[in-house]
Amino acid sequence: MFNFTDPANIGKAYKDFVLLAIDELPDYKARAVYLRHKITGLEVYHIIKDDKENLFAYAFRTLDKTSRGVAHIMEHSVLCGSEKYPLKEPFITLASTSLNTFLNALTYPDKTVYPGASVVRADYFNMMDVYGDAVFFPKLDHATFIQEGHRVEMDEDGKLSIQGVVYNEMKGNYSSFQPIAFSDLISAMFPNSYPAFDSGGDPLHIPELTYQEFLDFHQKFYSPDNCLLFLYGDIPTYQQLDFIDERFIGRLIKKYDCREGGAICNIDIDSKKPVIKMDIKNLQTLNFLQESCSLKTLAPETGSTGSFVSLNWYAGKADIEKLFLCEVLCGNDSSPLARALKDSKLGDDVQFQSFGQFREEFFCAGLWGVKKGNEEKVFNLVEKTLNEIYENGVSQEDIDSAVMGIDFTLREVNRYWGPFSIQLMEKTLKGWCNGDVCSRHLAPITSFERVKAELHKDPDYTKKLIKKYFLDPSVKVRFVSEPSENYFKEREAAEKLLIERLEQNLDKVQLKKDLDELHAYQQHIETSEETACIPTTKISELERSIDIPETTLEFITGADDSDIPLFISQEDTNGIFYVDVLFPFDRLPAEYLQHIPFFADVLTNLGWNGKGWDKCTAQSSCVMGDIWGRTLSGSIPDAPDCIAEADKYRAYNFCGRNWVGLICKALTERAEEALDMLAEIITKMDFDDKKHLETLMTELKAEKKNSIISNGRDYTQKRARAGWNENLALNEIMWGVSQLHTVEGYKKHDAKKMLKMFSYMYKECLKAGSIIHITSDSDSLKKLKPLLSDFAKKAQLTKLLPGHHYTMDELSPYISDFEACKDDKIQFLNVPGQTGYASAIIPSSSYLTKEASAENVFAAWLSNHTLWDKIRTTGGAYGASCWVDSIEKQVIMTTYRDPTPVKSIEVYLQSLKELCSTPIPKEEVEKTIVSNYGNAIVPASPKDRGARSFEGMLYGNPQRFKQVRVDNLLEVTEEDVEKACDRFYESAQKHCSKAVFSNNSAKTKNSAGNNIKIPL
């Protein structure tokens, strides 16, 4: 057997894959091998690690110097049928039938990536097969192009409009200030280079893309000699190469005429660095501004509180010293540059980072929310502050804080939006795509040790970095993005002109033919026989027993000699521990509940023990990885097992409560210092810094305003659910539209009064008692547990007092327009923008019942079939989904970036009626069960495993009930699913609350509802 990790085999080939390099990756306790296929040029990088969650990713360099969105449209389109899998949507069929822990497609400015992950090997290879066929051998027919990209449609009144999934998705992207400001900044810094264009597509330019250009793009960029296949996990390299060789290599050789003198030739097989075709290498060239200048752009005013003003410097290639410099200058609010910008009151929020997504980075320092006329003040402040920091030096505390922050980040294992291997994939591709060795960015801990050595050796090291990157560069770019109230009007006018131009050249006969073909294609419902080509795992092959994280309950003696509940979650945290100290807020009068989110935010931001907030932040950053305020609310499910579970702990008063408190994370070697500081914070919290509270208030308002559009789906859900029960009403008060009204009411002149209120709330919460939760590994626990009794006394933790259950009558005064939540008319959340969101809520069965499991299966099938076909594929929305929250006894349907959100609700309700008379085939039910099972076995990070297990205990829903849900799931039959469909339809006739987030144009002629004001 070929040994891929034997250096003696470098230069030798296995099935024509030449082993080029072996990389030791001690930072990740792994090693990697780099190979190139000597006939096709396909390259492979496999990070070999003892991890059963294997990941593959087909990646292609896909650069374009237009904003027509061809890379993005291609990303969608290759997943719409291929040679071996000639379905409408193999991707969604695969996603709805596999055990994947991650399955996606991602368009970056310089590449397109198709990753998939699974903990089941057979399932992993199934996904690799379907994805490989999709990227190398897609159908790419004209119907797919006009469905996913752009087309002209005509409504019932004869009015023309432009439609398309990507087109509508990107209209949503052009609906708020911040993403447009960032995009314009990047365009300015790299003029006439690929980053200056929108790889996702600008809706005003997407219709310029022709079908032939689309086909040519695939031919050019999706060839095997431009494919970078990233692999991660414990499946042996030879098995993966055997699979690629068997399924694809021969077909690729034939398709691309891979022979001497053929379409692919002149490959430098022995090159230790990636081979990049010359035309692609030319596209990778970045252009830079050659002299300092001032630039101004306009962006939509939606989400803005003023202009974005920044000073920018080119910084060269990415490396760890730039990350260190960012952390020193702006790693936390007390860092010197961040502090100066905040204290200036010239803007709402600090912007400082190195833009590292390209081969060359640039630093950006400035402010959001700058009032007109203050731009020059911001530029001068940034330069003046950097000069002062250089002249005066950086304090040791700021350096220690930065070192702690980076050390912690490099040690912590997180799942942000997928497996940890996705982060390794991105690090690898950053070098690989640009012609650097694949391991260039895979030694961050080792690299940072060199930075720490420089810090130890040279006291002026940080000063020299400031001089190198900020004071010496001859090119400085002053950038301003102003909010424009005319932005949407101007784009709408441009879109109207575009449609008029299209109409002038429109061949209406051909248009009708194209649309007829498209609609026939979209309306075709694939049979089980057709979808059977997608490989699946059978229910009989599934492990019935699943991994369940555990949390144990112990007690320690509190300051009042009572037993304080101590929850312990033992997980593999890599020498890090997480501690929650929580206090109930459910003994407060209801009028204070609306202020809980801001109260939690400020807990660690106003200082303690007589020290200023900045001093406290700097000190805590040297000891802890982080500390922040948190809230937690919920209810005990109305299920006999959950009620019985909660009854077991009734004497301790911790089940079914609402909590506020602190969570901190720290390295175990700093445990004693960290716990002492946490006790000091809890007992010596200050509420007297009026000036800083005003700053935090301004930042909160800006944050809420900036995020309104992007959180539209969340706001519709919470709004539509608010009238159903007390817990959901509280969610609306704290996190929904009602919270926006609360934040709008915060005024600077009330800061003193608010501090007094927060002080009262804090004291009342502390008097209500407390609980502690620890997540750490076994070695850390041995060190921590002896410290906890002393900590509980120092922190003055006391026995939990009984809580109060708020009634709807108590809560309703704090829900804006509460009467609108009580009927089934649509609640219209009106905002400016170019797209929308919808939510519809109907009743479901109770938690842990077999009926609930069947409803979960039906909802998943509905999402992946009917809603996908009718709302996403035909309707043009970017997404539509349905799921069951049986804890709250609700079925939730939502749409995302939806051009017709009101119509989507109508389609959903009509579909329920139609499906009652159209049974779902047994094979489809079984596939959906397998997919739902896959959701149950997705791995979690150590921190998240501990948190979920702990939170489950607080609400009578321990993680072991997850096994009950899996057992019920595996027993679901097609008859159960039919009955679930009937229940959905019957429930919808009785009660369906609805909310739509969009501009006024979303309303249809027949839609009636309540208009709900969106403030800020």
Positions of PLM-derived features:
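Non-catalytic accessory/assembly modules
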Residues: G81, K139, A143-Y174, Q178-P179, ...
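His/Glu-based metal-binding/catalytic segments typifying zinc-dependent metallopeptidases
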Residues: I48-K52, A57-A59, Y167, K171-G172, ...
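N-terminal cofactor/phosphate-binding cores enriched in small/glycine residues
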Residues: V33-V120
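Catalytic or ion-translocation cores adjacent to nucleophile or general acid/base/metal-coordination motifs
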Residues: E83-P86, S96-N100, K255-L283, Y578-D580, ...
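C-terminal regions of mature proteins
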Residues: F2-A8, G233, A402-Q570, Y715-E819, ...
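Acidic/histidine-enriched segments that form metal/cofactor-coordinating
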Residues: F2-T5, G81-E83, P90-F217, L323, ...
